Amino acid sequence: MPSIETQSTSPPPLRIPHREASAHKGNFGRVLLIGGSRGMAGSIALSSIAALHTGSGLVAAAVPDCILDCVAGFHPALMTIGLGDDGEKFADPAWQSLKDRLSAQAAIGCGPGMTTGSGGATIVEGLLAKKDLPLVLDADALNIIAQNDWLSDGRFERSKADAACVLTPHPGELQRLTGASAKDVDAQVEAAAELACRLGLTIVVKGGPSHVAYQNGDGGKQVWQNTTGNPGMATAGCGDVLTGIVTSLLGQGLSGPDAAKLGVWIHGRCGDEAAARWSHAGMTSLHALDALALVADEMTQPAD
């Protein structure tokens, strides 16, 4: 096992960047969340709204046309981009409509609710080639990568000159990516650390507790262990909220490891606030999302 850096229950030393009085929305990152399908509109909506509440100045959701109106109705500040679909999910031409919009983004998150069809696969494949854009990959984006064995063909490798790439798998997704059993936490953390170090990625190993694996400054394996969060967060949509938080932090200029560590800590703190009010059994991802704005404010860098 690599050495594990354990964060105490006090707030981590990382902070969301301070907001100057003269700032405008363009100073806080334009981010794009990509995903959703018929029956899974809530996933991409949760991610996108989480990015708004974490402080992103502008957030857009790129979704199949068939769910555009549904996703747009979740929040009036959320911009939406409709892409070609087959009536259920992204169709193959969706990437051609999307790719010219990417250069304006400070960070991109992809995967929540997307399904693993060929249209989604074309989008993920295109994003992997854009190594100048900070990227978060979650959910079905990870399943697509596992199905196509894209971790082993070189397209994932990141140098220090490339933008950050953060993966946020749950245990089942990590098993599909690495072969490490979802029932063996130590094996999963070790596999994530090896993969992160080999390819220059940051990997969030979601669980109780969650870990963040990344390459340290000496090129070795580093693992950080979080201490916020609770079993009530094992509920639909909580992972989607994390995707939005980490994407927002990347868009505000944090590095991959810092965005992942601070994002996981904030996410768990939101879950703790929700559980205190609604109970472990009764809380939902919406309750965690409701706590996010105040928790993010607490974690913002104060003025000098």
Curated annotation (Swiss-Prot):
Q: Where are the transmembrane segments?
A: none
SUPFAM superfamilies linked to this entry: Ribokinase-like
Record-annotated residues binding (6S)-NADPHX?
113, 170, 240
CDD domains named among the record's database cross-references: YXKO-related
Protein EC: 4.2.1.136
Needed cofactors, names only, are: Mg(2+)
Q: What top-tier enzyme class does this entry carry?
A: lyase
- Residues reported to bind AMP: 239
Judging by the UniProt lineage, the source's domain of life is Bacteria
Q: Which GO terms describe its biological process?
A: metabolite repair; nicotinamide nucleotide metabolic process
Q: Which reaction does it catalyse?
A: (6S)-NADHX + ADP = AMP + phosphate + NADH + H(+); (6S)-NADPHX + ADP = AMP + phosphate + NADPH + H(+)
Q: Which PROSITE patterns match?
A: YJEF_C_2 (PS01050), YJEF_C_3 (PS51383)
Sorted keywords for this record are: ATP-binding, Lyase, NAD, NADP, Nucleotide-binding
The YjeF C-terminal domain sits at 8-299
Give the molecular function GO annotations.
ADP-dependent NAD(P)H-hydrate dehydratase activity; ATP binding; NAD(P)HX epimerase activity
Q: Where is the signal peptide?
A: none
Q: What InterPro entries has UniProt attached to this entry?
A: Carbohydrate_kinase_pred_CS, CARKD, Ribokinase-like
Extract the ranges annotated as region (Disordered).
1-21
Write out the similarity annotation: Belongs to the NnrD/CARKD family.
Q: Tell me the subunit arrangement.
A: Homotetramer.
Enumerate the NCBIfam families for this protein.
Answer: yjeF_cterm
The record's function comment reads: Catalyzes the dehydration of the S-form of NAD(P)HX at the expense of ADP, which is converted to AMP. Together with NAD(P)HX epimerase, which catalyzes the epimerization of the S- and R-forms, the enzyme allows the repair of both epimers of NAD(P)HX, a damaged form of NAD(P)H that is a result of enzymatic or heat-dependent hydration.
Protein name (record): ADP-dependent (S)-NAD(P)H-hydrate dehydratase
